[in-house]
């Protein structure tokens, strides 16, 4: 195969403007004319990227439409890179000064001032700084809160209409605490509380004189009603009521050995007590203590039954001993 001459001249194609040597130009011209007559669809790279991913073809077309609207180039956000770089250098230098002071024992330098970015917007109500997007959301909300605290007319964020009339302003934290303290002072005094052994709160009972008198009156009315209804029966030993004992006198004492029908023993004078032996005084004192428990009036049948039961118990104990 003969090698082509590198110095051979080239000629341009009238269809695609590419250059060929004379022998190749004849072959290319016929093929290039056929390709030019065919209408090929343009290749869509967005559809190829959307296949096999979470993105949809509609999203890609939307982005391409926005790009074409802006002249084929997306607008880049303006960044204050020079200002940020200066803040970064200041922070590094301040940290180095702190490390040097800790190593040498020198006084610590003052902390660096927090620099606010120049593109931030300051809120006129709370004096805080936000970026442009956050300031659009925050400033209307902060304005509404400030008007509520001041108690003035509240303007809605959607228009210039003021909400007046039945609008009730919400109190702030300090105002709410003052209202609670005033309501507590105006109300009745709370009873003091104490803690029990288990740590639980126990409220101390404080009975007023009026409560005590009212309770006593209620008790008196109850006793009068019960005594009036059951006046015909003997209620001295009934359930829930104490027996009314007669006043004890020296002449009412009865010895245990004396019979029921026998007259009561006369009380001895101090001179008679000196003359009597000690045995008689001890027996008399014992008999007096026994009879004092029998001073209340009882039925004879009940007393006879009790004495018979005592005698039976004594006989049983003696038979067991012997």
UniProtKB/Swiss-Prot annotation:
Zinc finger regions, C2HC/C3H-type: 9-38, 119-148
Which portions of the chain have biased composition (kind: Polar residues)? 150-159, 221-238, 264-274
Q: Where is the composition biased (Basic and acidic residues)?
A: 174-220, 296-305
Which residues does the annotation say bind Zn(2+) 2? 123, 126, 138, 142
Q: Where does Zn(2+) 1 bind?
A: 13, 16, 28, 32
Q: Which Gene3D superfamilies match?
A: Classic Zinc Finger
Q: Which GO terms describe its molecular function?
A: zinc ion binding
Name the keywords, alphabetized. Metal-binding, Repeat, Zinc, Zinc-finger
Q: Which Pfam families match?
A: zf-C2HC_2
Q: Where is this region: Disordered?
A: 150-322
Low complexity biased stretches: 276-295, 311-322
The answer on whether this UniProt entry bears the keyword Zinc-finger reads yes
Per its UniProt record, the required cofactor names are:
Zn(2+)
**PANTHER family of this UniProt entry?**
C2H2 ZINC FINGER CGI-62-RELATED (PTHR13555), ZINC FINGER C2HC DOMAIN-CONTAINING PROTEIN 1A (PTHR13555:SF25)
* Family according to the record: Belongs to the ZC2HC1 family.
* Protein's name in the database: Zinc finger C2HC domain-containing protein zchc-1A
């Amino acid at each position: 195969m003969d090698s082509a001459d590198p110095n051979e001249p080239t000629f341009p194609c009238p269809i695609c403007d590419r250059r060929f040597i004379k022998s190749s130009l004849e072959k290319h011209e016929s093929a290039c004319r056929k390709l030019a007559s065919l209408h090929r669809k343009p290749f869509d790279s967005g559809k190829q990227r959307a296949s096999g991913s979470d993105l949809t073809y509609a999203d890609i077309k939307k982005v391409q439409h926005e790009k074409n609207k802006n002249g084929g180039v997306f607008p880049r956000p303006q960044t204050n890179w020079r200002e940020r770089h200066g803040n970064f250098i200041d922070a590094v230098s301040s940290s180095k000064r702190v490390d040097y002071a800790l190593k040498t024992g020198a006084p610590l330098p003052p902390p660096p001032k927090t620099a606010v970015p120049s593109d931030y917007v300051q809120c006129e109500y709370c004096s805080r700084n936000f970026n442009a997007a956050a300031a659009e959301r925050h400033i209307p909300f902060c304005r509404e809160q400030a008007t509520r605290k001041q108690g003035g007319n509240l303007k809605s964020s959607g228009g210039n209409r003021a909400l007046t009339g039945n609008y009730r302003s919400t109190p702030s934290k300090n105002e709410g605490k003052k209202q609670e303290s005033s309501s507590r002072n105006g109300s009745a005094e709370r009873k003091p509380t104490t803690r029990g052994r288990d740590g639980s709160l126990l409220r101390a009972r404080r009975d007023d004189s009026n409560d005590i008198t009212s309770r006593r009156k209620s008790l008196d009315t109850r006793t009068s009603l019960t005594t009036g209804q059951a006046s015909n029966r003997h209620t001295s030993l009934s359930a829930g009521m104490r027996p009314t004992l007669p006043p004890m006198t020296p002449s009412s004492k009865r010895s245990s050995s004396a019979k029921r029908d026998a007259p009561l023993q006369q009380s001895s004078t101090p001179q008679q007590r000196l003359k009597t032996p000690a045995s008689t005084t001890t027996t008399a004192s014992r008999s007096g203590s026994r009879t004092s428990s029998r001073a209340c009036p009882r039925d004879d049948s009940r007393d006879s039954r009790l004495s018979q039961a005592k005698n039976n118990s004594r006989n049983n104990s003696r038979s067991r001993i012997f």
